[in-house]
Swiss-Prot record:
GO molecular function list: rRNA binding; structural constituent of ribosome; tRNA binding
One GO CC term on file: cytosol
Protein known as: Small ribosomal subunit protein uS13
UniProt KW keywords: Ribonucleoprotein, Ribosomal protein, RNA-binding, rRNA-binding, tRNA-binding
Gene3D superfamilies according to UniProt: 1.10.8.50, 30s ribosomal protein s13, domain 2
Gene: rpsM
Physiological role: Located at the top of the head of the 30S subunit, it contacts several helices of the 16S rRNA. In the 70S ribosome it contacts the 23S rRNA (bridge B1a) and protein L5 of the 50S subunit (bridge B1b), connecting the 2 subunits; these bridges are implicated in subunit movement. Contacts the tRNAs in the A and P-sites.
Region annotation Disordered: where it falls in the sequence: 93-122
InterPro entries found in the cross-reference section: Rbsml_uS13_C, Ribosomal_uS13, Ribosomal_uS13-like_H2TH, Ribosomal_uS13_bac-type, Ribosomal_uS13_CS
Quaternary context: Part of the 30S ribosomal subunit. Forms a loose heterodimer with protein S19. Forms two bridges to the 50S subunit in the 70S ribosome.
UniProt organism field: Clostridium botulinum (strain Eklund 17B / Type B)
Classification via SUPFAM superfamilies: S13-like H2TH domain
GO biological process assignments: translation
Length: 122
């Protein structure tokens, strides 16, 4: 099993898809990696030689921020926004949507399950 950036890639999948299991690599980045290294996107992970795996590994290490480093960077960016008290930081702190979505009816993922209020008597 090929291990790249601390992630075991699934052996039966195509290389193009398997690379997307690494945090920070999507389909377009995966295609770019394979075109640069000259590896066929249709090849299966189990069919890759050790040299090809090393070539992918070195490309990712040199040119991309993935997995732990990327997660840490994102967390530090959010922490910085919270500390400086920006609007986005306040939204993060309160657990509300950050990018301008409405919150009167939607935003259940961010706000959690509904908290029902008791009806007022008329």
């Amino acid at each position: 099993m090929a291990r790249i950036a601390g992630v075991d890639l699934p052996r039966e999948k195509r290389v193009e898809i398997a690379l997307t299991y690494i945090y920070g690599i999507g389909l377009s980045t995966s295609q770019k990696i394979l075109s640069t290294t000259g590896i066929s996107p249709d090849a299966r992970v189990k069919d890759l030689s050790e040299d090809e795996v090393n070539e992918i590994r070195t490309y990712i290490n040199k040119n991309l921020m993935v997995e732990g480093d990327l997660r840490r960077d994102v967390a530090l960016n959010i922490k910085r926004l919270v500390e400086i008290g920006s609007y986005r930081g306040i939204r993060h702190r309160r657990g509300l949507p950050v990018r301008g979505q409405k919150t009167k009816t939607n935003a259940r993922t961010r706000k959690g399950p509904k908290k029902t209020m008791a009806n007022k008597k008329k």
